[in-house]
Each structure stands twice: as C-alpha cells, then as structure tokens.
Amino acid sequence: MTSVVSVVERLPVVVGVDGTPADLQVVDTAAEEAAFRGVPLHVVHAWPGRLVSWSRHRAAADQPDGRHLLELAIRRVQLAYPSLVVGTQLVDEGAAEALVRWSARAGLLVVRHRDEAGLGHGWGSTAAYVAHHSVCPLLVHRGAVPSRGPVAVAVSGRHTASLRSAFEAAARAGCGVTAVHVREAGGDTGDRLDTALAEWADQWPDVPVDRLVIDEDEVAYTIDRASRRCRLLIAGRGRKGWSVEAVYNSGGVAGGRQLCPVLLVPPGWPVGGRVPAEASRPAGY
C-alpha cells in the first residue's frame, strides 16, 4: 500500500504570476523554496480570457503573452536549478480563485504584493483574498528579502505549525527566532509559552530564541517594526482571519522601503507540514 506520507510530502510549491516584471523575483523565491524542499515547482498565470467579453481581440492577444511569460519563467528557473521539476498552467479564470483552488493541492503557495489601489499596505486585492482563503501556507513576497535580522513569529503558547516553521526558517538562514506573544488580560500563559518554545529549541539547539511579550495595543507597531527589521514574519492565520488583517493593515510601503516576506499558516495545518490525504495533484500536472 502506498504511504500517504510519501505522497503528500511531494506536493509542489505553487507560485502565482500576473505578467509584470516583478514576477521574476517571486518566481525566484518560489524556486528556491521548491529546491530546498525537494519538490516540484508549478507556475500559475491567470489571463483575462472569456472574462474580457468586451474585447475578443484583447483576450486573444493576452493568451500568447501569458504563454510567453510562463516560458520565460521555466527558462529562468532551469538556469538556477537545472534538476528542479517545473510545471506551468495558464488558466482562464480570476487569479484569486485559481490560486485558492491550487492551494488545496500545494505544500506552499507563493504570491507577491501588489499595491494596485495605492492603499499603502502593499498587498493588493488578489494577495489579500488568498491570504484569507488559502488552504496551504501562503508566502507573500514584499520585495528583496533582508539579509540580516531574525525570523519573527507570533506565538500563542500552543503547539503550532507556525512555530515549527519559524525554527526551520531560522536554522536555514543561520539566524535567531523572535517569538512575539500578546499578553492576555487577566491571564498568564507564560508556562505554556515556555514549554512550546523549549520543545522546538531542543530540536534546533543552535537557533537563538528571544521572547517578546506585548500588549494588544502594541500589535500594529510591533508588526510594522518586524516587517522592516526581520528576515521573515510568520503568523498563524487564525479561524477568523484577525492576524491577516493585523499584518496587512499595519506598516506598508511608506517611503518605498522594502518589507520582509510574510508566511501565513492556515488553521489546522499539521505541525509536521503534512496535509490530508485527499489533497492530490491537480489534473494535467
């Protein structure tokens, strides 16, 4: 009988591209993740197609452009990672819906921010929608990844996949972990927090750990500071999506400064990084 673990651990890294020059950077990020994990990379591009009913000529012109973009992405990835298996998909549907559908069959979904409305949070409607609905962990690329600083992770004191992800990322980058905990009114989760941190610290003894306990009114400031000073910001999405709102409504791209990537882990994502057996490879992959 085929092992479920052996199947699900081969789920690909999926990256969404929309046809702009900045997409090359996000493809690079996704390729690095896929190569590190030893899994295939799949590049997904949504083109207007039938959604642009007012201009058949424009829709027909977009499809070849989309195919050309995917060909460029494949060549770029294969130059950097010759042995990496790369697949592509040109889909005739909305980008947000397509990416959420693919997230049910991926181990990691990668998108870039796009401040298309000038809102200041640097995400854009597609990334914001996917952040709330992605089935797998979502990595939001927000510019050049800083080469210094720790990995910051929001922790609750529970045994979660986001905390494991933080230690794995820090060990890979050769840096420390800053565990940020929001103090609960009238409660003390210090012992639980210490236990959760100690468990992963035992597995990664070379990763330094700093603990930062803040009040609720300090969340926005802390996220903004972490976005500018850390290599990676990790948070569990939560069942109500409040952490997503906190991340993309805090900070932004003020002054044109680059912000670190954000990794959002959905509720219920297994601590070992494994997904349910029904999450299978997309048709045509």
Q: Language-model segments: what does each one mean?
A:
Residues 2-57, 148-190, 197-212, 232, ...:
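Small/aliphatic-rich secondary-structure junction motif
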Residues 60-74, 190-197:
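Short, surface-exposed alpha-helical segments at coil->helix boundaries
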Residues 110-113, 137-143, 262-266:
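Short beta-strand elements of ligand-binding domains
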Residues 110-129, 148, 232-257, 268-273:
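Glycine-rich, Arg-bearing micro-motifs that act as flexible, cationic patches
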